[in-house]
Swiss-Prot record:
Residues 1-50 are annotated as: Disordered. Specifically methylates the adenine in position 1618 of 23S rRNA. One of its GO terms (cellular component) is cytoplasm. This is Ribosomal RNA large subunit methyltransferase F. GO terms for molecular function: 23S rRNA (adenine(1618)-N(6))-methyltransferase activity.
Length: 365
């Protein structure tokens, strides 16, 4: 069996989101064109400069706190000047980070309501939307820029924040099926959908009832997905997850010149059990995902997942080779000093992928 080509590149619902995406509206087309034009007008990084966010990421040049406070006045209570005279928030304060997220989602993504329950993972918006932008590039490989298409995506482990479905729908107009094992998390995402008309009819929620399964029980016979995406649990135990959260808080305090102090797991580095850890950690989760992906090879164009630990890539490559995957790609992403990567694989040849994508094109004048 030939080895895959491995490449490295710099209310729970019954709506048919996974069956076929609806055509994008003229408003979503105009929105993407305006967003792409705005990003393209910004200066590009020079050769040799440190890799940062994706060129189309609206957060590439940091946060405009004045504009954010105007858009979301509740943020004002958490903004303060830094020693250098710039405005910022205390990123170790969970309420500050949650309000920053709500402000970013309102200003840049037209989300009027976003909230998460106490103890839920509070995602960094710039890094999460980076993943979405790189998936757009992956889907339209060879094109100079992604086009507005009919795309169905599956978010594995959407959590209580539903962030990938929100960003993918608002930036690119993609349809989403978002799954999770926690019914409380899904109930919160449904609350977000119910309070944002722009998401209604575009995001379907499905509950995973088997803690040992990932795609099984979620992907239905009539489903067809262009992309799957996932931010897997990093840790192998609750203790490991708690230590990781506390370590991040201490490092943040040290970076600000503060004396580290004892603290519980902060919400912005927190998360509920299924969001942060599982038996076997990230390595085992990815192994299960890869094994199950073979069962749905004909229904999904690209399978993808974030990989936080570089040492977990090698066993993934080996498992994918055994399955006879056609193409494997690793996409590196960087935000500040944090480096993570997207592992992507497809059982379809390039010719089949081109034929698949040709069926998505919505003619435009």
């Amino acid at each position: 069996m030939p080895k895959p080509a491995i490449k490295t590149a710099a209310k729970p619902a019954t709506s048919p989101a996974g069956k076929r995406a609806k055509p994008n509206t003229p408003q979503s087309v105009a929105k993407l064109k305006a967003s792409t034009a705005k990003a393209a007008s910004k200066p590009k990084a020079k050769l040799g400069e440190k890799k940062t966010l994706h060129p189309r990421n609206v957060h590439l040049h940091g946060y405009d706190f004045v504009a954010l406070m105007a858009s979301f006045p509740k943020l004002k209570a958490f903004v303060r000047p830094t020693a250098y005279g710039a405005l910022s928030i205390d990123f170790a304060d969970p309420l500050a980070v949650k309000n920053l997220n709500a402000a970013l989602l309102k200003q840049h993504y037209q989300i009027d309501f976003w909230d998460i329950p106490k103890g839920a993972l509070c995602p960094p918006i710039p890094g999460r939307v980076d993943y979405v932008h790189y998936l757009a590039d992956l889907l339209f490989e060879g094109a100079t820029a992604p086009r507005v298409e009919q795309v169905c995506a599956l978010d594995i482990g959407t959590g209580a924040n539903g962030i990938y479905a929100i960003l993918g729908q608002q930036v690119y107009g993609w349809q989403f099926v978002a799954s999770d094992i926690n019914p409380q998390s899904l109930a919160n995402v449904q609350r977000i959908i119910d309070n944002n008309s722009c998401l209604q009819g575009h995001v379907t929620l499905r509950r995973q009832r088997d803690e040992n399964a990932i795609f099984k029980g979620i992907i239905e016979a009539a489903d067809r997905f262009e992309l799957t995406l996932c931010n897997p649990p990093f840790h192998a135990s609750l203790r490991e997850a708690s230590e990781g959260s506390q370590r991040k808080v201490r490092n943040l305090q040290l970076s600000r010149g503060e004396k580290p102090k004892a603290t519980g797991a902060s919400l912005n580095f927190g998360g509920q059990a299924a969001e942060l850890w599982c038996q076997g950690g990230e390595k085992q989760f990815l192994a299960t995902m890869i094994r199950e992906s073979h069962m749905f090879a004909e229904q999904c164009l690209w399978f993808t997942s974030l990989v936080s630990k570089q040492e977990n890539l090698k066993p993934c490559y080996q498992a994918l080779a055994k399955l006879g995957v056609d193409t494997v790609k690793t996409i590196e992403m960087q935000q500040g000093n944090k480096v993570t990567r997207v592992l992507a694989w497809s059982f379809h040849s390039q010719a089949k992928r081109l034929r698949w994508r040709s069926e998505l094109v919505t003619p435009t004048e």
